[in-house]
């Protein structure tokens, strides 16, 4: 995310090895006396010329991280192309002597993907990102696959409408109905991917402004046994590869541990 990396955060941070280590160490120290584990998630690096994951993985472990997750893309790739699972395998091998779990992330859209990633990379587990957008049942499928059990059947359209309503109700309990009605709109598109509901219904759902309106729009589909066509796959924006925005002189000295100017006002990840 440019607004994050241009301040030295997100995928730009591990390039500054000492600064990265200081931050992980501080987080670990802050949790002393608790049972809260500090874990680190990172990308392969800034771009193909600046891979950071092997050094950063080792630094994270030495700084006390309980687990390390690698998304198999560089920041420059955004979500384009395919995740480099071979880099997850490299990190797992690199940290094998530490005993610290290495988790894989990137292009996990179905249960089979998780099983295949673990088989190909030797990673200790997987983290799911975009693949669960509009598909929260994916986690039950992943659990079944990794336990060697039968994969649960995909939900029908009627069942999905009930999940949408429950999601919206929980949002309303947390953020109020007005905010919930706005926030659920983006999720509805993901939930209904591949279902034959028609453009007019989708347009109405994209403008829903209350829970009652949502219930009314979804009611005709409550008993539908339709199944989604081609519902798995990438969700959200994929983008195109692009140059990563960095602070001036960021690449000059990887051992510089100075905190970038205004870094403390941006803490949303990246």
Language-model features: locations:
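Active-site-proximal loop/turn and secondary-structure-junction residues that shape catalytic pockets
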Residues: 1-3, 42-48, 72-76, 108-110, ...
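Glycine-rich, proline-tolerant flexible connector loops at the mouths of alpha/beta enzymes
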Residues: 1-17, 70-80
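A short, structure-level motif marking secondary-structure boundaries and short turns
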Residues: 9, 40-42, 72-74, 99-100
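Alpha/beta catalytic cores of nucleotide-metabolism and tRNA/nucleoside-modifying enzymes
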Residues: 12, 18, 22-25, 29-37, ...
């Amino acid at each position: 995310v440019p607004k994050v990396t241009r301040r030295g955060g997100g995928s730009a941070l591990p390039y500054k090895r000492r600064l990265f280590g200081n931050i992980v160490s501080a987080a670990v120290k802050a949790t002393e006396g608790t049972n809260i584990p500090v874990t680190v998630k990172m990308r392969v690096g800034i771009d193909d010329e600046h891979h950071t994951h092997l050094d950063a993985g080792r630094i994270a472990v030495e700084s006390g991280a309980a687990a390390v997750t690698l998304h198999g893309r560089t920041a420059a790739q955004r979500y384009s192309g395919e995740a480099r699972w071979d880099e997850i395998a490299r990190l797992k091998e690199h940290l094998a002597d530490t005993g610290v779990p290495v988790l894989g992330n990137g292009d996990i859209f179905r249960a089979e993907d998780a099983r295949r990633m673990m088989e190909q990379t030797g990673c200790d587990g997987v983290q799911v990102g975009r693949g669960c957008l509009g598909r929260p049942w994916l986690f039950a499928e992943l659990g079944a696959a990794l336990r060697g059990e039968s994969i649960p059947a995909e939900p029908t359209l009627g069942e999905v409408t009930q999940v949408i309503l429950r999601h919206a109700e929980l949002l309303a309990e947390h953020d109020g109905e007005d905010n919930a009605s706005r926030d659920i709109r983006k999720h509805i598109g993901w939930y209904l991917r591949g279902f034959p509901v028609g453009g007019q219904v989708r347009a109405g759902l994209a403008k829903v402004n209350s829970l009652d309106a949502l219930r009314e729009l979804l009611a005709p589909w409550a008993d539908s046994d339709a199944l989604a066509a081609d519902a798995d796959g990438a969700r959200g924006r994929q983008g195109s590869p692009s140059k990563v925005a960095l602070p001036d002189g960021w690449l000059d000295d990887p051992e510089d541990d100075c905190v970038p100017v205004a870094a403390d006002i941006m803490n949303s990840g990246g």
